[in-house]
UniProtKB/Swiss-Prot annotation:
This is Transcription initiation factor IIB 1. InterPro entries: Cyclin-like_dom, Cyclin-like_sf, TFIIB, TFIIB_arc, TFIIB_CS, TFIIB_cyclin, Znf_TFIIB. HAMAP family: TF2B_arch. It comes from the Archaea. GO terms for molecular function: DNA-binding transcription factor activity; TBP-class protein binding; zinc ion binding. Belongs to the TFIIB family. GO terms for biological process: transcription preinitiation complex assembly. Sequence repeats lie at residues 129-212, 223-304. Stabilizes TBP binding to an archaeal box-A promoter. Also responsible for recruiting RNA polymerase II to the pre-initiation complex (DNA-TBP-TFIIB). Zn(2+) binds at residues 16, 19, 35, 38. Pfam families: TFIIB, Zn_Ribbon_TF. A zinc finger (TFIIB-type) spans 12-43. The keyword Zinc applies.
Amino acid sequence: MVENQKKKKIEEIERCPECGSTNLIRDYEHGELVCGECGAVIEDSYIDQGPEWRAFDSEQNESRARAGSPMTFTIHDKGLSTDISWKNKDSYGRSIPTRNRAQLYRLRKWQKRIKVSNAAERNLSQALQELERMAFNLSIPNDVRETAAVIYRKAVKQNMIRGRSIEGVVAGALYAACRITNVPRTLGEIASVTRVKKKEIGRTYRIMSRYLKLNIMPSKAEDYISRFCSKLKLSMDTRNKALEILRDAENVGLTSGKGPTGVAAAAIYIASLITGERRTQRAVAEVAGVTEVTIRNRYKELTEKLKLNVEQ
């Protein structure tokens, strides 16, 4: 404790107490903090806290560093345990002799058993592997995966897993994480990478949101515009036109109480007609995960209320 406080005080020194100069030299060889102007030795027990090795590029830095990966909630033991590589090579990259490979195989097997020692850990390990699979298939970034893993762990602590499938709860946690981090994914998209029905995922999500007191804001139609337009290979002009239509619709209260994906799909469909990049209702509906009837209904409301002159 005393050493940490002393280290902190040394690190906070910015000026020479003798002449006031900011030209301070850290002499790690002699363990001294010296003023470059007047030569005063400010501290004579200065310790280099960095590594003792040198690296000349990022590859060398990574290979020589001995610290492990950062802690992560997406692994059941938070990444704090040791793994034995499946490559039959030692730490120097040399091949393991054939006579030692059977022993190494047994070590790997026991290490795997020890890492997951009880039913609760097996459940968590299985769930987080499933989460990783879903997130990978949906191209969901790491920060969202971390959030989803934390939500799932909270659900386990609240005993919300009992009577529900692991896959369903994981899907609900992933959808909740997407909503919290403003990375829009529809229930249909989540359901497309699971064996759980969309209705069940939605129900699990609502239960989680209520009991875990998740702070989730309602999703907005404009959150989906960029991704839907990208899937439909529409230009930036069409995207901007769709966003303009949505802003006008919000100003007159057309979006309240309606599904954001349906409104976004209709705005994109209208924008594609206006800019001449025509897309069929079926194509837009498939990307947005809504029905053609929904697009037609929202299309009619938007064109009539906003007085848009659109030729189908």
